[in-house]
Amino acid sequence: MSGGGKDRIAVFPSRMAQTLMKTRLKGAQKGHSLLKKKADALNLRFRDILRKIVENKVLMGEVMKEAAFSLAEAKFTAGDFSHTVIQNVSQAQYRVRMKKENVVGVFLPVFDAYQDGPDAYDLTGLGKGGANIARLKKNYNKAIELLVELATLQTCFITLDEAIKVTNRRVNAIEHVIIPRIENTLTYIVTELDEMEREEFFRMKKIQANKKKLKEQEAAQKALEGPGPGEDAAHSENNPPRNLLASEEDNLPVLFN
């Protein structure tokens, strides 16, 4: 039997092994197709997140610039109120909660900023500069929400990048390693089975030829040895000896009348 130098799975060539390899090949091809679709979906989401990151970073610069101007205006009209805010801080009003979004089997973290309870500084700037302080709070709240959204996008970007790399490695492994190995194994099994069938056919023909030759030799040997004693007795019973006198008397000419 041929050994085969190609990379293949070590199996004994049989019909059962051929069926199992066909099943494994079908499963590998289906898995390859599903992983390709998963990689395409992840790449689509990855590009969408990348576009949003670029847009949010541009928007973030404008929002932070507007918030900085609002802070300068509020300090100009209401004076330095930072010590008042620091003294009255008990807990953060804006909190961040996290949830997970499933994208074709990859869980992406999503951060959400929300205000916990009523605004404790609603009356800040009531004496002077109230409008500027209100605008300041609004701008910084917008900046916080945008920062949280940007953090979500960047975290999803990193997670998707790693998931895409892993998926592509799996796709390449199935396409260039697993499927060729199974195909080489199937080729080896089919070749070995065909060779075994040819060997079996040749062996059967050889056995038949030997039997025929043996029969011919036995027949020739019997012909050389002649009939046996049993065969002579049977021949005598079937063909009794002739009466030569009786036959000769019948054929004698009549000499006397």
From Swiss-Prot:
Keywords: Hydrogen ion transport, Ion transport, Transport. The keyword Transport applies. One of its GO terms (molecular function) is proton-transporting ATPase activity, rotational mechanism. It comes from the Eukaryota. Signal peptide: none annotated. One of its GO terms (biological process) is regulation of intracellular pH. The keyword Membrane does not apply. It holds the Pfam family ATP-synt_D. Residues 215-257 are annotated as: Disordered. GO terms for cellular component: proton-transporting V-type ATPase complex. V-ATPase is a heteromultimeric enzyme made up of two complexes: the ATP-hydrolytic V1 complex and the proton translocation V0 complex. The V1 complex consists of three catalytic AB heterodimers that form a heterohexamer, three peripheral stalks each consisting of EG heterodimers, one central rotor including subunits D and F, and the regulatory subunits C and H. The proton translocation complex V0 consists of the proton transport subunit a, a ring of proteolipid subunits c9c'', rotary subunit d, subunits e and f, and the accessory subunits vah-19/Ac45 and vah-20/PRR. Subunit of the V1 complex of vacuolar(H+)-ATPase (V-ATPase), a multisubunit enzyme composed of a peripheral complex (V1) that hydrolyzes ATP and a membrane integral complex (V0) that translocates protons. V-ATPase is responsible for acidifying and maintaining the pH of intracellular compartments and in some cell types, is targeted to the plasma membrane, where it is responsible for acidifying the extracellular environment. Belongs to the V-ATPase D subunit family. This is V-type proton ATPase subunit D.
